């Protein structure tokens, strides 16, 4: 864990990565298994209702509303894959990372990403531009980076994330 002098410590690698410049694995929000293709139809928390898809967990508005807005540990990929002392950041913790660190585009081991340096203590982490995965597979590697938080957005079809581009 890297101490950036913020409210939480940050991992030195992505989930599934060995080195900081490794992309790691891709996951849908609230899922703990990676896939080669990501669609609404194969999303863990959707259920087919004829022609429609219905969200069945982490729902704040529908008929299955459970009003859960933070991932449970069993649905938090960092907790499941990295161990019980790990979890994904909350939206507020991600905001703190953005606001209390200096972000600089760098290349590390041939991989573009951001060196995120704490304005509090000078320690840093590297966040690779790992892109994303969708119905067409992996996209925008070395161009963009997207990182989930544990926090559900007000619309249950969306979750808070932080993202960046090479520009």
Which sequence ranges carry the predicted segments?
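C-terminal, surface-exposed recognition/capping segments
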Residues: 1-167
């Amino acid at each position: 864990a890297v101490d950036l002098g913020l409210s939480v410590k940050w991992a030195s690698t992505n989930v599934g990565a060995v080195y900081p410049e490794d992309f790691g694995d891709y996951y849908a929000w609230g899922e703990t298994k990676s896939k080669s293709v990501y669609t609404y139809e194969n999303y863990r928390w959707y259920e087919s209702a004829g022609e429609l898809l219905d969200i069945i967990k982490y729902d704040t508005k529908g008929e299955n509303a459970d009003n859960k807005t933070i991932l449970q540990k069993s649905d938090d990929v960092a907790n499941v894959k990295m161990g019980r002392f790990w979890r994904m950041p909350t939206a507020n913790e991600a905001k703190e990372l953005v606001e209390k660190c200096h972000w600089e585009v760098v290349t590390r081991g041939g991989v573009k990403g951001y060196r995120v340096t704490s304005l509090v203590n000078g320690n840093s982490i590297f966040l690779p531009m790992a892109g994303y995965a969708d119905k067409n597979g992996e996209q925008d590697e070395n161009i963009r980076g997207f990182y989930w938080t544990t926090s559900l957005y007000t619309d249950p079809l969306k979750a808070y994330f932080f993202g960046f581009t090479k520009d």
